[in-house]
């Protein structure tokens, strides 16, 4: 099955993920695509991606290409991390994607200062650099058709972010990626996200 190519070029994306369904994997999948297309990736998260999973998703890239993945530990003051990411995105040539994985708490409202930091980051990046924010979605306790809630959705949209979701309807490899209102049914495997 062919790997899915997600439309993230020059986009600012807030990806809300149902717990443990592959949000980091989706970010790595998109990172590998950005590198394959000649770009560099800046990755920031509290924990570095699993080395085995990284190897699987980057297996089709050369070792030289894999070195275009630049990771930093996202701990402490988010405003300072934003400044470092902006500075690095201009210092390194051909940065095409900046990813912040687990950039906010796993539950509750996303504080407005965090959203403001992400808005500042988005507006400070060059027009040819995409931004992907990965966070856990909330659980919907209301009458909505969806089981999850995109935390900070309205504020993120006001800041110019597209809203994507990643869900799993049942155990197993089948996943659903929703990009704005477009639904992509896919399967997760060693290579990343593939059509099903």
For each of these PLM feature ranges, what is it?
Residues 61-64, 90, 155-156:
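Structural motif
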Residues 129-196:
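Phosphate-binding/switch region of NTP-binding enzymes
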Residues 2-5, 82-94:
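Conserved alpha-helical scaffold flanking the Walker A/P-loop in AAA+ ATPase domains
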Residues 32-36, 90, 123-126:
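Residue-level signal for alpha-helix termini/capping positions
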């Amino acid at each position: 099955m062919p790997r899915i190519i997600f439309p993230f070029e020059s986009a600012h994306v807030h990806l809300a993920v149902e717990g443990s369904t592959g949000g980091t994997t989706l970010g790595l999948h998109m990172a590998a695509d950005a590198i394959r297309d000649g770009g560099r990736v800046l990755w920031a998260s509290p924990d570095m991606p699993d080395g085995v999973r990284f190897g699987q998703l980057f297996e089709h890239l050369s070792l030289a290409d894999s070195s275009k993945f630049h990771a930093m530990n996202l701990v402490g003051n988010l405003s300072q991390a934003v400044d470092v990411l902006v500075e690095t995105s201009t210092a390194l040539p051909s940065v095409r994607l900046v990813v912040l994985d687990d950039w906010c708490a796993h539950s509750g409202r996303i504080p407005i200062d965090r959203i403001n930091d992400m808005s500042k980051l988005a507006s400070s990046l060059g027009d040819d650099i995409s931004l992907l924010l990965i966070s856990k979605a909330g659980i919907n306790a209301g009458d909505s058709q969806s089981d999850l809630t995109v935390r900070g959705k309205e504020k993120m949209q006001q800041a110019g972010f597209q809203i994507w979701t990643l869900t799993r309807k049942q155990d197993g490899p089948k996943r659903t990626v929703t990009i704005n209102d477009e639904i992509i049914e896919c399967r997760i495997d060693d290579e990343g996200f593939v059509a099903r």
